[in-house]
Swiss-Prot record:
GO annotation, cellular component aspect: cytoplasm
SMART domains: Cpn10
Gene (UniProt): groES
Protein name: Co-chaperonin GroES
Keyword Chaperone assigned: yes
Length: 95
């Protein structure tokens, strides 16, 4: 199934959480927090102003991003867990 977000929405794949701490302690699944870093998979066409002009999004597919802990809606597309969020939920682009 192909999916393209609408307007100012962004489809994001979370990066995997670290399995170990820097000191070598293995973190059990129950203690892991959801990662707040991801990769943009697809973007919508942009937000529409009152005058009808469309403003393109600042992020593009392939960008590594940081987002808020509670940002986005979890969805499953082609068996993969992804997030759909507004561009305003994105804190910044990494790198």
């Amino acid at each position: 199934m192909s999916f393209r977000p609408l307007h100012d929405r962004v489809l994001v794949r979370r990066v995997e959480a670290e399995e170990k701490t820097a000191g070598g302690i293995i973190i059990p699944d129950s203690a892991k927090e959801k990662p707040q870093e991801g990769e943009v998979v697809a973007v919508g066409g942009g937000s529409k102003a009152e005058d009808g002009k469309v403003t393109p999004l600042d992020v593009k597919a392939g960008d590594k991003i940081l987002f808020g802990k509670w940002s986005g809606t979890e969805v499953k597309i082609n068996g993969e867990d992804l997030l759909i969020m507004k561009e305003s939920d994105i804190l910044g682009i990494v790198g």
